[in-house]
Amino acid sequence: MIKPIIVGNWKLNGSKKLIESFLKQLNQFLIKYYKICTVVIAPPVLYSHLIQNMFSSDKKNFFLGAQNIDIHFSGPFTGEISPIMLKDIGIKYVIIGHSERRLNHKETNEIIAKKFCMLKEENLVPILCIGETKKEKIDKKTKDICKKQIDIIFNMYGSNAFDNSIIAYEPIWSIGSGNSAAPKEVQCIAHFIRNYVKSKSNHNIENFFIQYGGSVTKNNAKELIYQKDIDGFLVGGASLQLEEFSKIIEITNI
């Protein structure tokens, strides 16, 4: 059985006060689930050390994540973060390709693929977000869009691209809307993604996970995690609410 991975994407949220209160309680909660679930928190990067210091080194199921990297390893690029820097401070998982960055920062598939390759070069775990808009869904282009976003990774990195990697299927129309995709629909797309990646890999792919993201809450997590090809969640707003996030973790492990 695959060990579920639950990632909390805090986006541009958080404070020292929130972290001290939230993680003190989460730390105790995770003791119960350390063998059967991996939990990742991706805060604004400047809070990473504070979070690290609040978790004891014996927490084998807890990891720090980041929300983005630059397309350069170093140099005169004001305000950017390098994967080398993230690795240096103990971050393991990095979200790339989120629709908010595609839209607000005009990140193309090519830019995202380059970031993916940089993460792999540093032995970090990319969490590649893919998904369709509402119009693309209506036009029945979901699978074509997912294929396009996956293909460029294979074209740039090669057939072993998705070993030790995560794809988060996040239908753009559901993010932040409160309207999650139907579980059977999610399973259909996740199954397609898994088979497509396997067919392009030309080997027995290892440590490849598929998450669902898009208005994940304690109310829909149970039915979603029961889907065969869903290995966990990329949680947005709900990951900032201790009771909600803890319940999602608990449900995932039922």
From Swiss-Prot:
PROSITE patterns: TIM_1 (PS00171), TIM_2 (PS51440). It comes from the Bacteria. Keywords: Cytoplasm, Gluconeogenesis, Glycolysis, Isomerase. Gene3D superfamilies: Aldolase class I. Its EC number is 5.3.1.1. Pathway: Carbohydrate biosynthesis; gluconeogenesis; Carbohydrate degradation; glycolysis; D-glyceraldehyde 3-phosphate from glycerone phosphate: step 1/1. One of its GO terms (biological process) is glyceraldehyde-3-phosphate biosynthetic process. GO terms for cellular component: cytosol. Pfam families: TIM (PF00121). It catalyses: D-glyceraldehyde 3-phosphate = dihydroxyacetone phosphate. Substrate binds at N9, W10, K11, G176, S215, G236, G237. It is found in: Cytoplasm. InterPro entries: Aldolase_TIM, TIM_sf, TrioseP_Isoase_bac/euk, Triosephosphate_isomerase, Triosephosphate_isomerase_AS. GO terms for molecular function: triose-phosphate isomerase activity. The active site is at H98, E170. Belongs to the triosephosphate isomerase family. Homodimer. Involved in the gluconeogenesis. Catalyzes stereospecifically the conversion of dihydroxyacetone phosphate (DHAP) to D-glyceraldehyde-3-phosphate (G3P). This is Triosephosphate isomerase. It comes from Buchnera aphidicola subsp. Cinara cedri (strain Cc).
